[in-house]
């Protein structure tokens, strides 16, 4: 066991009947690290959080938090971690202050003991302190839930898709708050389906269908993209998608914002490709090289894993 790690996961597997929710997961989160689990809904992120927060047991493998085994030392683990589930787990009929007092009582503490830790966050919701939690906006619920998760001064924080369902401004503010908590020495494991949030993490793990597809810094993940990448746009986007996927030299093509991203073999002849599309009746065609991002890498590795593409 490496005590420089806040979390260690060795071969965790969890099944629900015939469904393998987690398949031999292995990763470590270092102390003081902001680590992101990046993947779509159904990837296994929530199951992993429930295992690490000792709510369920694995079928195979081991995990430790703060050097304590999740299977045998779960009571001690629960005293040292904060957990913010995806639905925030607030009591909607209690006010902001009543929710905080309730969670403080659960851990045998009070607001004064954690004032310095939660006050920068609490100040943003203090004007609504007498409002019932069920009447708060998504962003305010998010901040209240984070305060509740921090009320007992945990050393490790688990955040399961904390920015889902909140506006873009609240999302950005939340990541700023996480950076401040990291600076105070708290180790953070956060999951998100938003690929753009990956860049706010020290390291990330790409996860899909219960398997880890890669672990590295965001920059390291992107540098592993190993094929030419183009953006494609035209007057018939659906038709272009089908035509591009059938073209020799195109490894894969997928919608990406207002364009399609086109992954090709090396030596791909872009001029000939445009000429072919024009001859097939497409017009206003734009094709230009772009740099890969986290989402491109995720799609590439997901297709490699499933065998749907011969990229790389």
Regions found by a protein language model. Name each.
Residues 78, 222, 298-299:
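Conserved protein kinase catalytic domain
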Residues 21, 197, 239-240, 269, ...:
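Short phosphate-engaging motifs
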Residues 1-13, 304-312:
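ABC-family P-loop ATPase nucleotide-binding domain
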Residues 7, 14-207, 214:
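ABC transporter nucleotide-binding domains
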Residues 264-312:
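C-terminal coupling/interaction segments
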Residues 176-265:
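ABC transporter nucleotide-binding domain
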Residues 68-71, 212, 235, 267-268, ...:
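Short, surface-exposed acidic/glycine-rich loop or hinge patches that mediate macromolecular interfaces
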């Amino acid at each position: 066991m490496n005590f420089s790690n806040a979390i260690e996961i060795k071969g965790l597997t969890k099944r629900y009947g015939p469904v393998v929710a987690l398949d031999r997961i292995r990763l470590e989160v270092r102390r003081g690290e902001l680590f992101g689990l990046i993947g779509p809904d159904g990837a296994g992120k929530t199951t992993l959080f429930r295992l690490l927060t000792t709510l369920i047991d694995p079928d195979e493998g081991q995990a430790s938090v703060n050097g304590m085994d999740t299977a045998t030392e779960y009571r001690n683990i629960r005293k040292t971690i904060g957990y913010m589930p995806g639905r925030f787990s607030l009591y909607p009929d209690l006010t902001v202050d009543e929710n905080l007092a309730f969670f403080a009582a659960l851990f045998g503490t009070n607001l004064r003991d954690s004032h310095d830790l939660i006050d920068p966050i609490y100040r943003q919701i203090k004007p609504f302190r007498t409002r019932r939690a069920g009447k708060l906006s998504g962003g305010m619920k998010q901040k209240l839930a984070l305060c509740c998760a921090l009320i007992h001064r945990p050393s490790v924080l688990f955040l399961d898709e904390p920015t889902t369902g909140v506006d873009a401004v609240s999302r950005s503010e939340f990541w700023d708050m996480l950076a401040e908590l990291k600076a105070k020495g708290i180790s953070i494991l956060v999951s998100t389906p938003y690929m753009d949030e990956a860049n706010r993490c020290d390291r990330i793990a790409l996860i899909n269908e219960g398997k880890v597809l890669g672990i590295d810094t965001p920059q390291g993940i992107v540098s592993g993209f190993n094929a030419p990448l183009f953006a494609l746009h035209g007057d018939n986007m659906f038709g272009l998608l089908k035509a591009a996927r059938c073209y020799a030299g195109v490894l894969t093509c997928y919608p990406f914002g207002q364009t399609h991203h086109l992954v090709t073999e090396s030596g791909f002849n872009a001029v000939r490709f445009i000429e072919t599309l024009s001859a097939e009746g497409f017009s206003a065609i734009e094709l230009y090289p772009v740099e890969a991002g986290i989402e491109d890498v995720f799609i590439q590795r997901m297709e490699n894993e499933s065998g749907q593409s011969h990229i790389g």
